[in-house]
Amino acid sequence: MASPVTVLENPIPKSGQHLLFFLTSKQQLALEQRPIESSLGYSAYVDHGVSQGVIVNPSSIAAAMRSSLITVYGITKPGTDKQYISVISPTYNLIANRQNQPIETTQKALAACSDNDRNNWVYYLNLPQGTAQYAIYELNIQDSTSAPTVYSGPTPSGNSNLAAVYFSPNKDRFIIFSNTDTRHYLYWVNSTLQSGNRIAGTGSVMSASPLAATTITNVQTRSMTIFLYYMDVNTLLNRIVGKVTDNEVHWYANQVVEGAPPMKVDTLLTGVVVEEKWNCLYYIPDGDTEFRAFNDTIRDSFFDEPREG
């Protein structure tokens, strides 16, 4: 039986693509990014199956641009015991390893970043076999399969959330997490060195705090500014800014975000930088039920020198 089919030109400028939607043999929606110049090759859609059941909540979702298309990742649960890393938009498909097996996670954390070309990197937590310490896992997603890379150096707490950003001058990634210290701190690790580094001044972070990170990259100076947001033990929105050069981050003083409403204790947090002038943060304020936007205008005071604490 022939499949239903429809096509649109990708609205992303200069993508040179048609977005071809059709049904798989399992009667699920598929999407192929076909070049407008038909002589060029393309990656055929591979159906790993839809995870029956729900997108896990509480958990995290993450969005990133890949091949001129916004892709959303999530954690799905087909039954009562296992949960899997999946693409949940623009199609719904399990991510598989090189042996065509779905990729499991036992935790709620998920983050993603992009090189704004063909590569996405997705991060999650798992227990390596035979250990009791959670590790950060990385998937480099270019097509429908990926072999997980384990960051064995960092020691994230099991209830940590994650944030991830891409540093284009070095083609490097930086991942933020909370550690297993008795007093929680935020840590960073990059994909080259893969060792955990404590962020001074973040000792007030709430256990299992939501995390959001935005960036501004300066190609001329080969540097990047990270704006990291989190919840403190008083449920206030905090900000700390880091300057990336090579494989290192110089962190400035953390600050409570002036004027930001207190956060609902179980809210998650996301943000985007706008015109390199302000960060737009979305979270649920205390006493509310809806995600609200708060604009944090970028100021010179963000770059006060760091202090221990």
Curated annotation (Swiss-Prot):
<keyword id="KW-0134">Cell wall</keyword>
<keyword id="KW-0964">Secreted</keyword>
<keyword id="KW-0378">Hydrolase</keyword>
<keyword id="KW-0325">Glycoprotein</keyword>
<dbReference type="GO" id="GO:0016020">
    <property type="term" value="C:membrane"/>
</dbReference>
<dbReference type="GO" id="GO:0005576">
    <property type="term" value="C:extracellular region"/>
</dbReference>
<keyword id="KW-0645">Protease</keyword>
<feature type="glycosylation site" description="N-linked (GlcNAc...) asparagine">
    <location>
        <position position="295"/>
    </location>
</feature>
<comment type="function">
    <text>May participate in wall plasticization and/or intussusception or in cell wall turnover.</text>
</comment>
<keyword id="KW-0732">Signal</keyword>
<keyword id="KW-0720">Serine protease</keyword>
<dbReference type="GO" id="GO:0008236">
    <property type="term" value="F:serine-type peptidase activity"/>
</dbReference>
<protein>
    <recommendedName>
        <fullName>Wall-associated proteinase</fullName>
        <ecNumber>3.4.21.-</ecNumber>
    </recommendedName>
</protein>
<dbReference type="GO" id="GO:0006508">
    <property type="term" value="P:proteolysis"/>
</dbReference>
<keyword id="KW-0472">Membrane</keyword>
<feature type="glycosylation site" description="N-linked (GlcNAc...) asparagine">
    <location>
        <position position="190"/>
    </location>
</feature>
